[in-house]
Amino acid sequence: INIHNMTLKISAGVPQGSVLGPHLWNIIYDEVFRLKIPGVNFIGFADDLSLVVTADSFSETERRANEVLKAVDKWMTENKVELALQKTEAIILHGPRKRERINVKIRDTEIQTVKQLKYLGIIFDQNITFTPHVKYIASRAGDAIAKLSRLMPNTRGPYTNIRRQILNGVANSILLYAVPVWKKAIRTARNKAILESTQRKSLLRVSSAYRTVSGAALQVLTAEPPMELLVTERAAIHERAKVEVITREIRAEEREKTMDTWQGR
């Protein structure tokens, strides 16, 4: 096999939306993830970059954070990639010893320390309770349910099975997004109540029931398991996806486990 190599100098950027663009970006951006700094993990999606810095002391955390930011900024400058400083934020995910801010800088610009940070659709808070995220997805799902309900009146609307597919499908896609990350949040009564309340709004519209009907009764009427069990089910499917290909049979198995748990209560 004859192999010929050719080097070309590129003098223009790749048009936005091109097929080749993402692949070329991944090739270039991969160098950032090869930076080796102890206690620092790189997480990236497209052009979003997250740096997770860990250390035994707060001062060491600051030192490592500034070191990695300096290295990333140097790489971006050399590769003519612009860093959006106005969009760059820092958050302290702490234990019992609380610190409100961390002193990290890029060049001469201090990075703002925030109490909540949204990354890839998930809201992280300092105490890692995920309560702000639960409130956020509950609000989004509630708005979606309200808008869809205007299109589907209780009378002269679609059949119940169609309502279930549409309303529960939309609501659950929002409520169960990225569940493996925040699944432990469902352990608190507060977060559980927020999710169950949002689910109840959807089930009221699915069943065309009176507002006085309880959430537990609506779940039985519509054959929809409690949100707490749906969170556990989705997380279990994700765990199985790490070692096997997810099929309809596997989803059916997990749903059967959910129903057994529900009926055993």
Sequence positions of predicted segments:
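Active-site palm subdomain of RNA-directed nucleic acid polymerases
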Residues: P22-V53
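Non-catalytic, peripheral interaction segments enriched in hydrophobic/basic residues
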Residues: F45-A46, V53, T77-R97, R101, ...
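Catalytic palm subdomain of template-directed nucleic-acid polymerases
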Residues: G13, S50-T77, G95, T129
